[in-house]
From Swiss-Prot:
Residues 524-546 are annotated as: Disordered. One of its GO terms (biological process) is protein refolding. InterPro entries: Chaperonin_Cpn60_CS, Cpn60/GroEL, Cpn60/GroEL/TCP-1, GroEL-like_apical_dom_sf, GROEL-like_equatorial_sf, TCP-1-like_intermed_sf. It is found in: Cytoplasm. Keywords: ATP-binding, Chaperone, Cytoplasm, Isomerase, Nucleotide-binding. Together with its co-chaperonin GroES, plays an essential role in assisting protein folding. The GroEL-GroES system forms a nano-cage that allows encapsulation of the non-native substrate proteins and provides a physical environment optimized to promote and accelerate protein folding. The lineage of its organism: Bacteria, Pseudomonadati, Pseudomonadota, Betaproteobacteria, Burkholderiales. Its EC number is 5.6.1.7. The keyword Cell inner membrane does not apply. It comes from the Bacteria. It comes from Burkholderia pseudomallei (strain K96243). This is Chaperonin GroEL 2. HAMAP family: CH60. Belongs to the chaperonin (HSP60) family. Forms a cylinder of 14 subunits composed of two heptameric rings stacked back-to-back. Interacts with the co-chaperonin GroES.
Length: 546
């Protein structure tokens, strides 16, 4: 086991605070509409230019072991805030730095760190309660666009695209972000259920100009096994042919004689069919097939329920108004499933989301809910270069998360004003002793810091602006984008309540831990191996021999 080094008391805290400051100073330059860029070096490929606080934080590793511990703790603030609310990472970092900086002064002066922490916790709880009181629900598309615009560092086109996407697919719908193929941002909305499997043979295509196989008013056969023998399919094919409607077959695979026969019948115009593989794998495939069955009013033909292909009838087949099958995707539009059954299925999946332990499982379950309840919107981010698209994509992701947070918990005036307004509730608090009162005063000072940083990044005098905003009431604040004072909600400077709340709670949590730390244990630095003297054979210096 490697030797460890231990540092105690003020020496440990001072080093930790240095690490906090190094990371926070790099992150906080990105805050606000006039925040600056940070360039991140990459081992491979071109550098990344970003205004995304959490992207900057994640890149930072310090050479000094103890400083690095401090930096990693603040990095945790940014990551936790990003995970919970999707935005507010820079605000959380600024708040954490301010609480640590102010708290360190009191600890150095001999105050009890535990009482300081109790005072900090009491003040934060009061601030959160007050935030909830001043929060108002997000109701209009305009407010959603404003929240998204602020989170995207003031880019209105991103805000409009996100608001439009939510309008089209609803609050439950899936919105994904992809690289675009042009300079402009685009919105592509898929109505109905789409899954990532395409036709098994290009001979199924009947719209060559769009490279699609399109079926109007089709039956849908869902099977959880491979189909290779055409004899298994014949009974159901005959029934579909008599009904005079096309057929979509979704199975684990369709191959050999079965696929060849379907292709020949399709080319000759005897029976219009398309075969696709079932989406997903294992248990997830079964669940997705069941989703499609419920959405289309059909049943999955599976031995588990006693159904076989030979005995399948039209009653077991699903129906839809239209199906479009491309090379890589299949889209079912307007399935014939009963709404109560679909709602029950959505409720069941939501219960699974609540119990899911991994982010991946949760994300996939949410996708299934969206496909059943709403639709899927794809925002394609455009740009002139790969670096520009990557930077813009980060901002679109932030804006998307912020918008969802706003829909969830409502909005408060942005630009750091909400944190100034909650100071009144904290100022009235009484601590159990002088040290707790000092903890409360730490939070009172820290709550000004996001506004101070936004103003400083805009090149203005922070103290003057903070005093002017504090003298105002309600939504009155400073719009750093225009350099004017006024009603921030009216001018569209909004923050999701969840983002502001999460940033404050996470910052206070980690800052409290840092202030109550009295020792650090870290790996001792390794001594560098001595350099080989020049002239030694094989050492690579002058006079080496072969």
């Amino acid at each position: 086991m490697a030797a460890k080094e231990i540092i105690f008391h003020d020496g440990a805290r001072a080093k930790l605070v240095e690490g906090v400051n190094l990371l926070a100073n790099a992150v906080k330059v990105t805050l606000g509409p006039k925040g600056r860029n940070v360039v991140l070096e990459r081992s491979f490929g071109s550098p990344v230019v970003t205004k995304d606080g959490v992207s900057v934080a994640k890149e930072i590793e310090l050479a000094d072991k103890v400083q690095n511990i401090g930096a990693q703790l603040v990095k945790e603030v940014a990551s936790k805030t990003s995970d919970a609310a999707g935005d507010g990472t820079t605000t959380a970092t600024v708040l954490a730095q301010a609480i640590v900086r102010e708290g360190q002064k009191y600890v150095a002066a001999g105050l009890n760190p535990l009482d300081l922490k109790r005072g900090i916790d009491k003040a934060v709880a009061a601030a959160v309660d007050e935030l909830k009181k001043i929060s108002k629900p997000t109701t209009t598309s305009k407010e959603i666009a404003q929240v998204a615009t602020i989170s995207a560092n003031g880019e209105e086109s991103i805000g409009q695209r996100i608001a439009e996407a939510i309008d089209r697919v609803g609050k439950e719908g899936v919105i994904t972000v992809e690289d675009g193929k042009s300079l402009a941002d685009e919105l592509d909305v898929v109505e109905g259920l789409q899954f990532d499997r395409g036709y098994l043979s290009p001979y199924f295509i009947n719209h060559p100009e769009r490279q699609l196989a399109v079926l109007d008013e089709p039956f849908i056969l869902l099977h959880d096994k491979k189909i290779s023998n055409i004899r298994d399919l014949l009974p159901v094919l005959e029934q579909v042919a008599k009904a005079g409607r096309p057929l979509l077959i979704v199975a684990e695979d369709v191959e050999g004689e079965a696929l060849a026969t379907l292709v020949v019948n399709n080319i000759r115009g005897i029976l219009k069919t398309v075969a696709v593989k079932a989406p997903g794998f294992g248990d997830r495939r079964k669940a997705l097939l069941e989703d499609i069955a419920i959405l289309t009013g059909g049943q999955v033909i599976t031995e588990e329920t006693g159904l076989t292909l030979e005995k399948a009838t039209l009653q077991e087949l699903g129906r839809a108004k239209r199906i479009e099958v491309g090379k890589e995707n299949t889209t079912l539009i307007d399935g014939a499933g009963d709404k109560p059954n679909i709602d029950a299925r959505v409720k069941q999946i939501r219960a699974q989301i609540a119990e899911a332990t991994s982010d991946y499982d949760r994300e996939k379950l949410q996708e299934r809910v969206a496909k059943l309840a709403g639709g899927v919107a794809v925002i394609k981010v455009g740009g002139a270069t790969e670096v520009e698209v990557k930077e813009k994509k980060d901002r679109v992701d932030d804006a998307l998360h912020a918008t969802r947070a706003a829909v969830e918990e409502g909005i408060v005036p942005g630009g750091g004003v909400a944190l100034i307004r909650v100071k009144q509730a904290i100022a009235a608090l009484a601590g159990a002793n002088a040290d707790q009162k000092a903890g409360i005063s730490i939070v009172l000072r820290a709550l000004e810091e996001p506004l101070r940083q936004i103003v400083a990044n805009a090149g203005e005098e922070a103290s003057v602006v903070v005093a002017t905003v504090a003298a105002g009431q309600g939504n009155y604040g400073y719009n750093a984008a225009t350099g004017e004072y006024g009603d921030l909600v009216e001018s569209g400077v909004l923050d999701p309540t969840k983002v502001t709340r999460t940033a404050l709670q996470n910052a206070a949590s980690i800052a409290g831990l840092l202030l109550t730390t009295d020792a650090t244990v870290h790996e001792a630095p390794k001594d560098a191996p001595p350099a080989a003297p020049a002239g030694v054979p094989g050492a690579g210096g002058p006079g080496f021999d072969f």
